[in-house]
């Protein structure tokens, strides 16, 4: 069986880890970074992911997609999505099924399809490190993700060519990373997770009895549309307003300027975590009839804190709810762990520390803890990590719509999963032949105030007065937090079973089509890599041949030199094209044409072997030259990758 990797699929950055012996290890990507920006760019002929996508964002803002996690599993008409429609430089559209999709380079794409590009990058990063194919993963999601968002994340994994062995909640993963090597007794930990686009709070009890550790989630709460992106947007709007006051020009109408502003705001926010003042200086940000305009604004830490004060306060409300749900007070919490890049902001740390009345743990890396925890869970699933039991919960209540548009709950929020529950219902009318089971998720009594997860019909009910037929509805939540529902007519035994896919969401056929599309692109990528390798080998051969011609000097006959130069010209022409076979053929012909050069080089080497003193000097030079050629060839090859 291959290795199972752990992936933190983040809003702003993503991270991949694997169990290395008994320790989880974060894997560096091809650029040498431990985290990868969750940014995807679509150009006319390729898809860029991570740093390469981020670097070109300023010149290609409408086709560069970021924070796609904020859209995954969401409806286009959702208030949160509509807010993003107004501020994102890329185009967010409504799909035929009502989902929020993205349009780039004239192509309409579902969020799972775009997220799959990030997962493919994580998969490749792990494969390069392990030296073997990776087909299985544990992927993390915000604890407060609903069923649609979890299902969409699993779809993204499938499209990326990964079997998602488990969906695990981010705060739970962070607690695993923190607690796996701490074998003390009972410990109640609060995990405050403020990432790029989502916020979660989980209260987790870590028990260690007779060498077995139990991680039990007591309560969870959060906001799936609150994170670092919102903090950035406050600063972006402030800078745009300041510029408008000074220049009477609104940068919000200029996508290129807004992309530069976004990068500058993000950089300024990070700088203000370690300094009390910074300056945003963007020359030539835009221009009008009077000439170019420059943006220069000084920002203090106090100013930034005033801009985001309500966002920080907003994150404290779920803490109170989670504590109440767990039936605990602040004094019952032993440790507080901060996860997510936005928790590096001093004001956030100060407010959380003040809320819990205790010092925060400093030994957890907020960017890597979640991926490490996912790798630990992967180890549990593969049997490499023993004596660890993880008991997670469902974040929201689940039920069905009953008479009077009331939501009747079958499973309460914060119930440990996996779990099952069933309840018997009846018909509302005489001789009713079918019932519609409308599945809901949320805490409101009125059905319309909750998230609709989908509906299905149970037909063929025998005619009977209202209230007589007995229909058993059973809910079954698996370890991923995904819901399976069945309805059975107790008299006839007729049953209808479904795995809940949101009333929106992607069908199996759509996911399969996207998988095939991804596989087709994988073939294209492999062919492109082979082409680059052939070009690099050809360039290396030409470079080495030119050096040998110089070294041969007058010993190389003019007609041979002419033949070799013609072969080199053919190689140059071939490498400008995209025909791998033509490049390889031209390279082979150059090798054959250079046979005279090889003879001269061998004769020189034999002559040098006869020298008793200083024989090594010329030979060393030749070897040094060879080494230079090899090293340069390897470097070019790596660079192209």
Curated annotation (Swiss-Prot):
Residues modified as Phosphothreonine: 198
Composition-biased stretches (Acidic residues): 627-641
Record PROSITE patterns: HSP70_1 (PS00297), HSP70_2 (PS00329), HSP70_3 (PS01036)
Induction remarks: By stress conditions e.g. heat shock.
InterPro entries xref list: ATPase_NBD (IPR043129), Chaperone_DnaK (IPR012725), Heat_shock_70_CS (IPR018181), HSP70_C_sf (IPR029048), HSP70_peptide-bd_sf (IPR029047), Hsp_70_fam (IPR013126)
Annotated region (Disordered), positions in chain: 601-641
CDD domains, per the entry: ASKHA_NBD_HSP70_DnaK-like (cd10234)
Keyword terms, alphabetized: ATP-binding, Chaperone, Nucleotide-binding, Phosphoprotein, Stress response
Keyword ATP-binding: yes
GO function term, MF aspect, one: ATP binding
Name of one Pfam family that matches: HSP70
Bias (Low complexity) ranges: 601-622
Family: Belongs to the heat shock protein 70 family.
NCBIfam families according to UniProt: PRK00290.1 (NF001413), prok_dnaK (TIGR02350)
HAMAP family, A to Z: DnaK (MF_00332)
Function as written in the Swiss-Prot or TrEMBL entry: Acts as a chaperone.
PANTHER family: HEAT SHOCK PROTEIN 70KDA
The protein's name in its UniProt record: Chaperone protein DnaK
Native source species: Shewanella piezotolerans (strain WP3 / JCM 13877)
Name of encoding gene: dnaK
